[in-house]
Regions:
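Extreme N-terminal starter segment of soluble prokaryotic enzymes
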Residues: 1-2
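NAD(P)H dinucleotide-binding glycine-rich loop of Rossmann-like/cofactor-binding domains
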Residues: 91-144
């Protein structure tokens, strides 16, 4: 699949990449819209983000789209569902999460890869931060 891959400081290349294989609890989403935010710009200028992305890696984290594939154990979703996903999910188990401060999570899971034809959403994000979209919400509006 075609993807925008971050290789380092101000170095993003359009490349053919292998589509990741689904693991337990994951879904594949065909990208409807992928947007660029201030964090993307900072990462592009710096060439990395200490916790979020290590080059080379498919870039982008704000997106919406349609589920095209699901691991066998995924429940509550179906192929063709329109969705938006947050780019992270807390662990729910660390001291910060248990104290209702998930933004400080010791094991915050980040998701990148929206600047591609499709993205695989990890199980924790599917469970905690994958949201359905009604048909009256456009993909660009949802990704915002």
């Amino acid at each position: 699949m075609k993807a925008a891959v971050l290789h380092g400081q101000e170095d993003v290349r359009i490349e053919e990449t292998d589509a990741p294989i689904l693991q337990t609890g994951e879904v594949r989403i065909r990208i409807g819209t992928a947007l660029t935010c201030g964090t993307d710009l900072k990462v592009y200028r710096r060439g990395y983000h200490a916790r979020m992305i290590t080059p080379p890696a498919v870039f982008g984290h704000e997106f919406s789209g349609t589920i095209t594939e699901m691991a066998e154990d995924v429940a509550g979703w179906k192929i063709g569902d329109r969705v938006v996903a947050a780019n992270s999910a807390p662990c729910g188990e660390c001291l910060y999460c248990k104290n209702h401060q998930p933004n400080l999570c010791d094991d915050l899971l980040f998701l990148n890869g929206a600047y591609a034809e499709s993205i695989v959403v990890p199980a924790r994000i599917v469970e905690k931060n994958l949201l359905p979209l009604s048909t009256d919400i456009a993909f660009p509006d949802a990704a915002l």
